[in-house]
Amino acid sequence: MRQCLFALLAALILVPSLASSQALEITVERDLIYGRVEGSALLADIGYPDGQNGLPAIIYVHGGRWRAGSRTGRNALDVEQWAGFGYFAMTIDYRLVGGSPAPAPYLDLLCAIRWVHAHADEYGIDSDNVYLIGNSAGGHLVALAATLGEGSFERVGGWSDARSDIRGVVSAAGPYELNTLSWGDLWTPVGGDVHAARRLASPIHQITENTKPILIIHSDDDQSVPIQQAVQMADALKAKNVRHEFVHYVDRGHMAITDEVITETRDFIKAIGGT
């Protein structure tokens, strides 16, 4: 009798395990072209669970002071991991300011958002649950998307008829005021008032009642982006009654997408209505 009971318990344990592994059948696509600008392809990697609908989407934007880095760097979001969480996950490359002046990186992010909306039916994406995550310069870009949105920028790269809205963003170690940032001078458009252009591209100056929820993650000893940038951004969001969270780490340096950041991100998305 005891042997039969043990066998039954083992079967009950095994069945959920098998069902779980079957539910995690994932497709990963590399080097997908999400847009074209002046004949050059904008590339992304994507991952998603097969045969699912209503997937929240998350787009990762890499750091590198807008002049370096890539979607495949050591700090990049793992699209296969996030697909396993039940997301459509995307990591993007964007034009770097060494070859294309600002605001090229931001325009490419907006193109990626439109691509996701344009392909929502194809990949089973819930268009009302599109999220962004970035670290360092990528954190700046996603925060700008949450505050400024498309602004008056021209749509480039493609999908000009698609939606470009997002549900919320996560910025790890991102800068929010470019005119006071030590490397803010890298954000230099061609012609015009450079100071005004950097102010336009500073999320802290673009906060309105329409700003999307933002999770700010920063360490007190960040030498690349001083934590004062994050503190001031959180204060500005609070002053405008914008939903946000500020997670302040100690002695973590210039933060990347660590396991802790992933946990904070998933909790934040759940809190604002995602999965």
Q: Where are the regions a protein language model picked out?
A:
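N-terminal cap/lid segment of alpha/beta-hydrolase-fold proteins
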Residues: 22-52
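Mobile cap/lid helix-loop segments that gate and shape the active-site cleft of serine hydrolases
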Residues: 37, 174-206, 212
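C-terminal catalytic histidine-bearing segment of alpha/beta-hydrolase fold enzymes
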Residues: 45, 227-275
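Short beta-strand element of the alpha/beta-hydrolase
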Residues: 54-64
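Short amphipathic alpha-helix adjacent to the substrate-entry channel of hydrolases
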Residues: 72-91
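Primarily recognizes the serine-hydrolase "nucleophile elbow" in alpha/beta-hydrolase
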Residues: 111-183
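Acidic catalytic loop of the alpha/beta-hydrolase fold
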Residues: 177-178, 221-225, 255
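Short beta-strand/loop motif that positions the catalytic acidic residue
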Residues: 210, 215-218, 222
